Amino acid sequence: SQYEAGGDIALIDFQRGSNNFRVGTWQGYHGVDLIATVDLSEVQDINRLAGSFLQDQKSWIFMPKQVEFFVSNDGKNFKSVGVVKNHISQETEEPVMYEFSIDKKLSARYIKMVAKKIDACPDWHVGAGEPGWIFCDEIVIE
């Protein structure tokens, strides 16, 4: 990806992006879902899971349709623990950052986050019908 913010580890580096996607803290995914798995090395208690995303529709960057979180103790069998739907309007002109989060008491070693891409840039958009981008700067595990 052109926007890789230092590679896979960037999504768990505690470095938050600004509403300027050109700042090097954003991971960009073009026309694909974002699927990221974090290994905590051992089973840990978790109270909150979140993914931080950016929308800048003038640059073809849209919020995911939804973000789903999964947990596992073995890294193979994952259980869904929550889905967060997007409620940010695609027509918002200014860049906006939003955290898709769930508050739930969990215990797991592996966390998987799946952010579903939009089907295509909306009909009213200059890029109508073309794939959009998903930009994420952090996966939050508390």
What is each residue range found by the language model?
Residues S1-G17:
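Predominantly extracellular/luminal regions of secreted and cell-surface proteins
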Residues R16-G82, E94-E142:
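Aromatic, loop-rich ligand-recognition surfaces of beta-strand-rich domains
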Residues H87-E94:
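Short proline/glycine- and polar residue-rich coil/turn motifs
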